Amino acid sequence: MLTAEKVKQAAKAMGADLCSIGTPDRWEGAPAQMDPRFIMPEAKSVIAFGFRIMRGSLRGIEEGTFFSNYSSMGYGGLNWLYIPHTMINMAKYIEDYGYEAIPLGHLSPWRAIDNVGNLKGGSRPVEPGKPAPDVMVHLRIAGFLCGMGEIGWSKVFLTPEFGPRQRIGVMLTEAELEPDPIFEPHLCDRCMLCASECPGAISAERSVKATIGGYDLEWNDLDCDRCRDAFRGGEYAEEGEKGEYMSHVGQEGIKPSPITPFYRRPNKVYEHGEAICGGKGCIRACMIHLESQGKIGNKFKTPFRRKKLWSVDWSQPDPLQIAGE
């Protein structure tokens, strides 16, 4: 007999750090384009899996010396390699008990909606009453409805085990498993360090409110376009300034910001990434704050930030070029 406890034990054995279970009826009232019941109408359980972002994968950016590791080992490698591997094996495990399982994983590259929920117009419903493919299950909301954690002001998902340091995978199954209670939000105390240390996208004033699973939730109204540029190390050039940081990828008017040492935006790692900011506000500042309060179960013998944070002054000449003259 397949039980929730067996599923959680198998998930840990196969590489997940967290596993929690919800029921599809918790999505009642969700937008059709984000409702998992349209993907598997006979689903009895929704399973959320958490995969830690190693604190060490952020170390190179914190020191300003090794930037690619977070984008590879803490970001793209998790999303494109590690999470799919674990999810596929978990789906096989459940199907060996005779229950169909869909390993949605972390990615939805063919989704019908954009980052703010608007239809992109690239597909149409196959019949009346159905949403346009592909339906995209909102991962952070799935994590919340499965009882894994909460959505912080930054819009990043927080858990008592790792704070903001995890990525989420989702699975649907026809197996009926005992659900976990929805997580009572309490980790985010609205310190707003995520906003004050973000290089350009998190608002401390504007917010989005939604009632989900019986809870009134609120997070910042994230400017996704600014986040796209800022987390890659870019900021908008003023009139008269050069804006060539992303010109090699067809985007003009962007200059390097103080959080990047690179003259040009680096290439992608595992299909996406270029996460030059290393979650400066939404992950690192949040993590430091929650660790200082003792709210994170994954504890370390030393604090993460050990000296003043660096900043690149692009108005000054490159010291290596000066040394070579």
Segments and roles (model prediction):
Residues 30, 72, 76-288, 298-306:
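Catalytic cores of enzyme domains
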Residues 1-14, 30-33, 112, 164, ...:
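N-terminal and secondary-structure boundary signal
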Residues 58-59, 102, 295:
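Short, solvent-exposed secondary-structure capping/transition elements
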Residues 291-321:
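C-terminal/domain-terminus segments
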Residues 39-40, 122-123, 310, 314-315:
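Short alpha-helix boundary/capping motifs
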Residues 25, 53, 177, 204, ...:
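Flexible, active-site-proximal loop/turn residues at the rims of small-molecule/cofactor binding pockets
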Residues 1-88:
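Non-catalytic, usually N-terminal nucleic-acid engagement modules in DNA/RNA processing proteins
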